[in-house]
Design a protein with these regions (language model features):
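Histidine-acidic metal/acid-base catalytic patches
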Residues: 3-117
Length: 117
């Protein structure tokens, strides 16, 4: 990654005159860099995109295959009023032969945990 902290994102965005660049949160990068989600919430309503995936220790896994506290992260985001987009990011080699199955697994996980119907 070129930008590894929310503060670096803020600095880069301040250099862009168009206002079209927005900050994002990559769950895996946040964990890998030993950061807390609250640092990204400092972006406020500008935070508009989140890469959502499970991980162990530094791979992008389908939800439920790793050991991250995904429910805790989603609760924090909901409590903070996050209204942006999520992208499922699951590119671990185990999914290459059937990537659709990883999507289905993550969607089922989200439904099981009441994230959406």
């Amino acid at each position: 990654n070129v930008l590894n902290t929310p503060e670096q994102q803020k600095e880069m965005i301040s250099l862009m005159p168009s206002g079209s660049m927005k900050p994002m949160l990559d769950i895996g990068q946040m964990v890998y860099m030993d950061q807390k989600i609250e640092r990204y919430l400092a972006h406020g309503a500008e935070l508009s995109h989140i890469h959502l995936h499970d991980s162990h220790p530094a791979v992008h896994m389908a939800l439920g295959d790793g050991d991250l506290p995904i429910c805790e992260y989603l609760d924090i985001l909901e409590s903070a009023g996050y209204k942006g987009m999520y992208a499922l990011e699951q590119n671990d080699p185990r999914y290459r032969s059937n990537p659709r199955q990883a999507d289905i697994q993550s969607i089922r996980w989200l439904k099981k945990h009441g994230i959406f119907d």
